[in-house]
Amino acid sequence: CWDNCLILTVHSIQQIQDQIIDEFNFFKDWSEKYQYLIDLGKNLPEFKDSNRIDSNLIKGCQSKVWLNSSFDNNLVIFEADSDAIISKGIISLLIRVFSGHTPEEIISANVDFIEKIGLNSHLSQTRANGLLSMVKQIKIYALAYQAKK
């Protein structure tokens, strides 16, 4: 199969986190990094209004952050939105890291990119708590899908 073959490269959660770390290391200061977060948020795929329901709201976030999940071929797929642009950028990073992986991979993943890019120390306490709530909710969805198997 040399012609017309689709080669699908699947990156591990750690590889994706390493890519994000490399991207953030490119920027000189936090104003550039915040702008990058804002741009990431603006590029999130459109979130259906039908998914903006209370059961998809992440508890513990100061702003409204909706997280929807689905399960297909043993992979958890996430989509999200927020009414706050920084939160939208943060959740876009988390979706990039976790979406398209098995529940087991998500549950066992060590989320280290947040600290390595310095994001945790450049967020207000309420935003930092919201970030932890986002990660927690992603892992809860993965646990639920694992239990259903």
Region spans (language model):
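Leucine-biased recognition of intrinsically disordered, low-complexity hydrophobic segments
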Residues: L6-L8
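N-terminal intrinsically disordered, cationic/polar leader segments
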Residues: V10-I21, N25-K64, F71-D72, I114-S133, ...
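Solvent-exposed interaction patches of small proteins and small membrane subunits
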Residues: S55-Q62, D81-S82, E104-A109
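Conserved interaction-surface patches within small, structured recognition/assembly domains
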Residues: S70-I86, I95-F98
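Residue-level signal for short amphipathic helical patches enriched in basic/charged
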Residues: I85, H101, T126
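Primarily the active-site beta-strand->alpha-helix module of PP2C/PPM metal-dependent phosphatases
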Residues: I91
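Glycine-rich phosphate/pyrophosphate-binding loops
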Residues: G100-I117
